[in-house]
Amino acid sequence: MSKNEIRVRYAPSPTGHLHIGNARTALFNYLFARHNHGKFIIRIEDTDTKRNIADGERSQLDNLKWMGLDWDEGPDKGGDFGPYRQSERKDIYAQYIQELMDKGLAYKSYMTEEELEAQREAQKAAHQMPHYEYEYAGMSDDQIKAAQEAAEEKGLKPVIRFRVPKDEVFEWEDLVKGPMSFEAQSIGGDFVIQKRDGMPTYNFAVVIDDHLMKISHVFRGDDHVSNTPKQMAIYQALGWKVPEFGHMSLIINNETGKKLSKRDESVLQFIEQYRDLGYLPEAMDNFIILLGWSPVGEDEIFSLKEFVKMYDEKRLSKSPAAFDRKKLQWINNQYMKLSSADEVFHVAMPQLLDAGLIEKNANPYKMEWMRRLVELFKREISYAREIVDYVKPFVNGPEDISEEAKAEMQEDTALVVIKAFRDRVAAMDFMDATGVLAAIKDVQKSTKVKGRKLWMPLRIAVTHETHGPELPESIELFGQEKTLAHLDEMIAQLEENK
């Protein structure tokens, strides 16, 4: 590895599925690595055994692949700096825990959760910021040893705490936020680096892993800023170089103005949910990258390769990024328009199957008919599930005519136009869009009705809608039999209402 090689990582916890915020972290690290011809590493931080879910890791990796991300090292690929799961690195962490203890920079703490809670409550009552108070204050080494042995005899299990240097000031030049500074006293006292079950805490394990995996830059969310001084303290204690840090802005709900929270049910927040709705991965990438990063110029639609080429971490925003679902829908619609009919049909197929609009083993003719329906409406939809409402009328028959549509049928010429068109459809040996268009033009010529007064009654009679894609194509896909049935129904209604 060259001295200046860029190495970044995305390190998810398998405690849940891929969240929008975490997907953004993965994307920004990926873009930085690929733009700088560096390495992108996946590491699974699975030390929180109580919260890990069974398919958490698989789900994370599967959704990253769906987004088009590839990585150079990881739990599924291996690499020179593995293992890439923290649960498989416990012996490595234990080695460095012992090194810190041997240096007097870490120690065993036997305070119970109840004692710690009582300490916090007393501090709050005294209007102090809650912090850990050294439990061995004023004790000699022999007294400390005796106290620890007594705790062991009671069956208490210790945590290991890192001894924070009291007068230290932790400073770094953040790649996003600029100069940052924390005084040691603001950290909250000596913090835990190993839990009672022997597992390392996040702040300890991440330092060991990032150093041994030669991570050069750490891009992560703004909520990790307060972790940085703790991690810097461990780097310094072990005599290691600190990587460069960049903390990305918060994502807020544009409707509430509040930080996007996993508990906020008003917003879909997991990549899996957008996949299920039939969003395109390229659109999700595009939308997420624009949450806190801005390209030069007015254009907003770019492929992942284009983002890699133009990426500049200096254009990461310090201000919160607004999550706007309508903006996502607009971006996805742009990609729907750019995609081929086959690509959109592939994405829409699960939605059509779930809605019972087609069978998995449907004959080739019906498959092609459905593909053409999807092609007809692909410019109209924001995401694939919306195709269901557009296709349903062609399979199950149109919905009832709206009051708006009924008002359009009050024109005196409506019945004349529909009857004339019905006669021409009935006379067709083969009905396609070209023939339908010719028939409409023939009706215009014979009835002298044109424009909206010609097209609107025909659209409403066949589709029961006042707007939609090209009418000849729609009529072709309804087919001659259904089209005649719809026209006859409308003629009967209009004659009855005369």
Swiss-Prot record:
Cited Gene3D superfamilies: 1.10.10.350, HUPs
HAMAP family for this protein: Glu_tRNA_synth_type1 (MF_00022)
Keywords tagged on the record: Aminoacyl-tRNA synthetase, ATP-binding, Cytoplasm, Ligase, Nucleotide-binding, Protein biosynthesis
Motif ('KMSKS' region): 259-263
MF-aspect GO terms: ATP binding; glutamate-tRNA ligase activity; tRNA binding; zinc ion binding
Protein name, per record: Glutamate--tRNA ligase
Xref: PROSITE patterns: AA_TRNA_LIGASE_I (PS00178)
